[in-house]
């Protein structure tokens, strides 16, 4: 006898993005990508934002561009968050359940995070020692469980689920120093639980970070960026310089991939797929950190010698304006955080290891590696900055912004890039001078 599920699976199209469906997931027919995205979003209690009008197109090629609209459509189409296991492990609670209908009000509560906060507060009051969080992918979206210490707990720290997870992804058992609270925003809700005692860095974290630091090319960029005083740079000259600079930065990312400690763990096909999708993001991250002195110094001096025409100013697009504003925001965020080299290399690895990218064959392996460096970054920030409990979430929340900017850059006409970088670098250099 045919079932409702059999009839729907025959359609073979994901109800969220239209990609090839693999079955009934959390109540509706969907693909593996949307299934995993929904699970991570709910398990990690993520709150997204849409930069447009909350009706972005959802397709196989565009689904990663707006996490807000993707999750919104998951809920609107009937994905059942209660079908997800609380521990975040594979295997839903009820595979035969169909789609659920929830009110617009409840959807809004979920999208705003209000529902998660209320559930977390209830769980905290009922059982303050329970581990309610499960780490997800750091890279396509922000990964934000909230590790803090609970001095008042009478139970052993080893009862907390983080111990086994930490050992699983770092590979080396270590002493427990903290526990998870239910959601990211618990930091401000429970200020008395923030750890103040110093602790040591996990030896495995130290090793993995050093491997990433070794893979990074910190030599100054070789692209000439010095212009004699009084020389007027033309649009075509500046564009050519930006192209040469992008070529060198891209070459360095290709070399970086070959030096990664997990290079032998993935296929060349997967590396090609990951790099071809994330190279702009990697260049942006490295420009904000490793090569920031040259980018915001030498290159900014070159762009200052370029004077756009009235026509160029008039034709500057809305996409270009949005990218410029977001780049300035991201620059100020990195400057405010003073991102260390150790944090940068972890963020770069997390961003690169994005299992949601279409075409990857070893999805689970990429996700495992992603989680490993997610924990390494968390371990390091809590060790190095014990009095900055929001630092790790702040770092992780920069990654979706990096992705969004990189995605928007492709929509900016090439002839507008000289003006975009002139305006961006001028604003950043001005803010540095004021500091």
From Swiss-Prot:
Biological process, per Gene Ontology: animal organ development; anterior/posterior pattern specification; cell migration; midbrain-hindbrain boundary development; neurogenesis
NR LBD domain: residues covered: 204-435
One term under GO cellular component: cytoplasm
First and last residues of each zinc finger (NR C4-type): 14-34, 50-69
DNA-binding region boundaries: 11-86
UniProt keyword list: Cytoplasm, Developmental protein, Differentiation, DNA-binding, Metal-binding, Neurogenesis, Nucleus, Receptor, Transcription, Transcription regulation, Zinc, Zinc-finger
InterPro entries: NHR-like_dom_sf, Nucl_hrmn_rcpt_lig-bd, Nuclear_hormone_rcpt_NR3, Nuclear_hrmn_rcpt, Znf_hrmn_rcpt, Znf_NHR/GATA
Composition bias, Low complexity: 142-156
Disordered: region residues: 84-157
Subcellular location: Cytoplasm; Nucleus
Pfam families reported for this sequence: Hormone_recep, zf-C4
Disulfide bond sites: none
Regions of compositional bias (Polar residues) in chain numbering: 121-141
Entry superkingdom: Eukaryota
Main location: cytoplasm
GO molecular function, one term: sequence-specific DNA binding
Main function: Probable orphan nuclear receptor. Binds to a response element containing repeats of the motif 5'-AGGTCA-3'. Required for anterior-posterior patterning during organogenesis. Acts with chordin to play a role in patterning the midbrain-hindbrain. Isoform Em is required for integrin-mediated cell matrix interaction during neurulation and for the morphogenetic movements leading to formation of the neural tube. Also mediates the effect of retinoic acid on primary neurogenesis.
Family the UniProt entry places it in: Belongs to the nuclear hormone receptor family. NR6 subfamily.
Subunit structure: Homodimer.
Entry protein name: Nuclear receptor subfamily 6 group A member 1
The gene coding this protein: nr6a1
């Amino acid at each position: 006898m045919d079932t409702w599920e059999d009839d729907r699976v025959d359609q073979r199209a994901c109800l969220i993005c239209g990609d090839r469906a693999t079955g009934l997931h959390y109540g509706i027919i969907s693909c593996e990508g949307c299934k995993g995205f929904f699970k991570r979003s709910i398990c990690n209690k993520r709150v997204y934002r849409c930069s447009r009008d909350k009706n972005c197109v959802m397709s196989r090629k565009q689904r990663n561009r707006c996490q807000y609209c993707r999750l919104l459509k998951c809920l609107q189409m009937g994905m059942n968050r209660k079908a997800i296991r609380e521990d975040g492990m594979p295997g839903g609670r009820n595979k035969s359940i169909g789609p659920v209908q929830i009110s617009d009000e409840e959807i809004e509560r979920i999208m705003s995070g209000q529902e998660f906060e209320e559930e977390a507060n209830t769980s905290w009051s009922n059982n303050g020692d329970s581990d309610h969080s499960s780490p997800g992918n750091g890279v396509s979206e922000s990964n934000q469980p909230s590790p803090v210490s609970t001095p008042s707990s009478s139970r052993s720290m080893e009862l907390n689920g983080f111990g086994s997870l930490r050992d699983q992804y770092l590979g080396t058992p270590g002493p427990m120093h903290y526990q998870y609270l239910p959601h990211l925003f618990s930091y401000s809700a429970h200020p008395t639980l923030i750890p103040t005692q110093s602790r040591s860095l996990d030896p495995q974290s130290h090793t993995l970070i050093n491997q990433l630091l070794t893979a990074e090319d910190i030599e100054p960029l070789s692209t000439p960026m010095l212009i004699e005083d009084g020389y007027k740079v033309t649009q075509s000259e500046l564009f050519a310089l930006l192209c040469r600079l992008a070529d060198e930065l891209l070459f360095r990312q290709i070399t970086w991939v070959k030096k990664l400690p997990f290079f032998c763990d993935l296929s060349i096909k997967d590396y090609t797929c990951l790099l071809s999708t994330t190279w702009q993001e990697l260049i942006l991250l490295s420009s904000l950190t490793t090569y920031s002195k040259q980018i915001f110094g030498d290159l900014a001096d070159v762009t200052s010698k370029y004077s756009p025409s009235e026509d160029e100013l008039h034709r500057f697009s809305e996409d270009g304006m949005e990218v410029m504003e977001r780049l300035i925001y991201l620059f100020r965020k990195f400057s405010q955080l003073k991102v260390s080299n150790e944090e940068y290399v972890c963020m770069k690895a997390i961003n690169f290891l994005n299992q949601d990218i279409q075409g990857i064959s070893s999805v689970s392996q990429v996700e495992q590696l992603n989680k490993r460096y997610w924990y390494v970054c968390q371990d390091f920030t809590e060790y190095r900055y014990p009095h900055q409990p929001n630092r790790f979430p702040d770092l992780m929340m920069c990654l979706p912004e990096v992705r969004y900017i990189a995605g928007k850059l492709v929509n900016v006409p090439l002839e507008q890039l000289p003006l975009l970088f002139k305006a961006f670098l001028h604003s950043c250099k001005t803010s540095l001078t004021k500091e």
